[in-house]
C-alpha cells in the first residue's frame, strides 16, 4: 500500500503521518536495541562512564563535583549552552534540597536530556493529492549525504512507495555515479544530467518526470562544497526556488545531514544551513564510530530541530528512525 501519491484528502493526510520515518513494529525490538547500545558504546563511555566514576563513593553534591560534571558534559560535545543549562538545573535542584544524593544525578540528567531531545516536528508543507513528497537533502561534502539518500530511499521503497533519486550535485561526477548505483540497488527511478549542468535545471526536469511517472517520493541530492559558503547557499537557494515554481510547496522537507564525528562543528553547520534554507529535519551519521554522540543533545536543544534518522553503521538497515527514549536508554542504562 502506497504512502504518497494518494488521490484523496484522507489518504494524503495519513501519508503525511507515515512520512515521519516510523518503521513497522516487527522491525523494532530487542535485536535492534542491543545493536544500538553496541554502536553507542563510545558515547556512553564518554558521558555515563565518566559520570559513574565521578559519583562513586560521593556522599554529597559539592561545588567541586559540579565543576567536574560540567567538564564531563562539555567534553562529551553537548556544547557550551546546553552544558550550562544542565548545570543550572542541577544547581537549582541542589539549592532547593530537591537533589541531595549524588547517585540521583544520573537520573536527573537522563530526564532532562530526554526532554531536550523531544523536539516537536518542524513546520512542513504537505504535498497536494496526486503530487510527490519532495525532499531536498543538504550538507557539506564528506558527511555521507549520498549514501544516506540511498538508505532513505530503501526505507520509503520498503513501504511500497515509488521513489525517484535526483542527482543535483552536478559538480562532482563521482556523486552522480554513486547515486545512480544506489538507485539501481534499491530499485528507484533516477534523474541526472551531465556533470557541470545547472542543478536547478536537473531538479526542474526531475519534478516534471516525477509528476508524469506518478512518483510518490523525490529525494534530491545537492552540492556540499562550492568556492565559498555564499556560493553554496546561493546555489541551494536557487534549487529551492525552482522546485517551488515547478511544484508549489516543494521542497516539502529539507533534511540536513551531519557527521557526528565532527562534534561542535556540526552545530555551526546546522545553524548556517538552517538560516539559509529552513531545515525541517536533521540526519546524524557515523554515530557508531564516535564518542561525540552528545552532539545530538546540543543540536536538539540549541536549534530546536528534530532528528529524523541516525546512522549507526554501514549496512543499508543501519539508517534508523531516531527514537529519543531509546537513544537516552542506550546511553544511560
Locate each region found by the language model.
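P-loop/Walker A NTP-binding module and the surrounding RecA-like catalytic core of P-loop NTPases
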Residues: 81, 111-333
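Non-catalytic terminal/linker segments enriched in charged/polar, low-complexity residues
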Residues: 1-123, 130-136, 158
Amino acid at each position: 500500500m502506497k504512502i504518497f501519491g494518494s488521490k484523496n484528502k484522507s489518504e494524503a493526510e495519513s501519508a503525511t503521518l507515515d512520512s515521519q520515518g516510523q518503521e513497522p513494529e516487527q522491525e523494532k525490538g530487542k535485536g535492534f536495541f542491543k545493536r544500538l547500545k553496541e554502536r553507542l558504546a563510545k558515547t556512553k563511555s564518554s558521558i555515563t562512564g565518566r559520570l559513574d566514576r565521578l559519583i562513586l563513593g560521593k556522599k554529597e553534591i559539592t561545588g567541586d563535583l559540579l565543576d567536574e560534571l560540567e567538564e564531563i558534559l562539555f567534553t562529551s560535545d553537548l556544547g557550551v549552552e546546553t552544558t550550562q543549562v544542565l548545570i543550572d538545573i542541577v544547581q537549582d535542584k541542589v539549592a532547593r534540597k530537591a537533589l541531595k544524593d549524588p547517585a540521583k544525578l544520573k537520573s536527573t540528567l537522563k530526564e532532562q536530556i530526554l526532554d531536550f531531545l523531544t523536539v516537536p516536528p518542524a513546520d512542513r508543507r504537505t504535498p497536494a493529492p496526486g503530487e510527490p513528497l519532495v525532499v531536498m537533502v543538504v550538507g557539506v561534502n564528506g558527511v555521507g549525504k549520498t549514501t544516506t539518500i540511498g538508505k532513505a530511499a530503501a526505507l520509503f521503497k520498503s513501504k511500497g512507495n515509488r521513489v525517484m533519486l535526483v542527482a543535483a550535485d552536478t559538480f562532482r561526477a563521482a556523486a552522480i555515479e554513486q547515486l545512480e548505483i544506489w538507485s539501481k540497488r534499491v530499485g528507484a527511478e533516477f534523474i541526472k544530467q551531465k556533470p557541470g549542468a545547472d542543478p536547478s535545471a536537473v531538479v526542474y526536469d526531475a519534478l516534471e518526470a516525477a509528476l508524469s511517472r506518478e512518483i510518490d517520493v523525490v529525494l534530491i541530492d545537492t552540492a556540499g562544497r562550492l568556492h565559498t559558503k555564499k556560493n553554496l547557499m546561493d546555489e541551494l537557494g536557487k534549487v529551492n526556488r525552482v522546485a517551488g515554481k515547478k511544484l508549489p510547496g516543494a521542497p516539502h522537507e529539507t533534511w540536513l545531514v551531519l557527521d557526528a564525528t565532527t562534534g561542535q562543528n556540526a552545530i555551526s553547520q546546522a545553524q548556517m544551513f538552517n538560516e539559509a534554507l529552513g531545515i525541517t529535519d536533521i540526519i546524524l551519521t557515523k554515530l557508531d564510530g564516535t564518542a561525540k554522540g552528545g552532539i545530538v543533545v546540543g543540536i536538539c536543544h540549541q536549534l530546536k530541530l528534530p532528528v529524523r534518522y541516525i546512522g549507526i553503521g554501514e549496512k543499508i538497515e543501519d539508517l534508523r528512525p531516531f527514537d529519543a527514549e531509546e537513544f537516552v536508554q542506550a546511553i544511560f542504562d
